[in-house]
């Protein structure tokens, strides 16, 4: 009979546990697998704040063939940090320094290498053709009190998208820089004062950012639910979606979350929006405060939208050698997981795509019915800045394109200013503190033009105050 020798280290650990009266904790039961719903993957969209914004851009560029729109809150251009496999082999810190330097504090890097890399990866099949971006609806936001990501970085994101959208005349993009927010997800009335750059990074500025993003992407929506929500916030197992690797090796949590309205749970036709938290906003750090209070669920509840909340973890190789260094729970936009981080094969992009595939795997296609040209309905002013206005409307059945007409001043004559294929329009290059009137007509594939929508008036904001010290500048 062999004598089993107990290692001395185990004896010491056992003694400590016994002396302190600590009982071994039972492992928590894993969350259930992510469910499947009747959602069309080509109606999917994504948004994020800070590192989540950089990841949203990466995902939207990598999978541009299926992503309908992208919301970029306090983020920058695609592949901004420019981390490469050579950096990884040599242990270079360059990408991390670029991420925390030019890609946050500015001035941002030259965009030409980023365009060349995106085009190179597209030719090799590592990402979708970036010219698909011309069909996406893009919302970019920088608060002038943001002391963490310089507004010049958001300017670079705007210029990156303009390159693929075809220039300033493309009305699929809207850039908001006239709100005095700090580095934050911005809400109407939840969170810290508007100019803060700390805490949970959710600031209240009387600005419904989640709703504005969703309406810029999908058109005018039903009013959000201001009462008890009908749906459920569901925890799901992220481990099966990184298998055979552990989620920790991707700096992702074992559990993610998804908000599913009752209509989507009943398998009515739905759409998916992916909402990515920023650094220091994951569940491990702020519990469910971002998930419940970012503002998406209230809009989702009345508009058949599923909101996916993937989760990162704080990573420290000193305590877990299989976890990459990620002290603030950021998404990987500089190469801390590996140097495929910005393409389809990136570990986190692959996992988020697997989540999206699962959620949309119950989709039942519906044949479109022929319809007469009708006036777009429900037209709303979705957002205004000091130099722009964003309008949205409910899609008209059978419409192939929409023509937006504008009038200003005392002149009541409307002139066409552009055509779009989707139900929203970003009108930039306007004068501050000036009213503009808009109406929209729909055109069918045969060229038949329908009647005009009702007229809405958007008044642009005044020029924001000069802000030399972000975080302390006045908010009108």
Task: Place the predicted regions along the sequence by residue.
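Extracellular low-complexity, O-glycosylation-prone stalks/linkers
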Residues: 398-416, 439
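Cap/lid segment of the alpha/beta-hydrolase catalytic domain
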Residues: 32-34, 81-100, 188-199, 281-290, ...
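Short beta-strand element of the alpha/beta-hydrolase
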Residues: 268-278
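N-terminal cap/lid segment of alpha/beta-hydrolase-fold proteins
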Residues: 103-121, 220-267
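The feature captures the conserved acid-bearing segment of alpha/beta-hydrolase catalytic domains
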Residues: 80-164, 168-173, 213, 260, ...
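Pro/Thr/Ser/Gly-rich low-complexity, intrinsically disordered linker/stalk tracts
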Residues: 369-398, 432, 447-467
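Primarily recognizes the serine-hydrolase "nucleophile elbow" in alpha/beta-hydrolase
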Residues: 40-91, 122-124, 222
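Beta-strand-rich modules
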Residues: 427-446
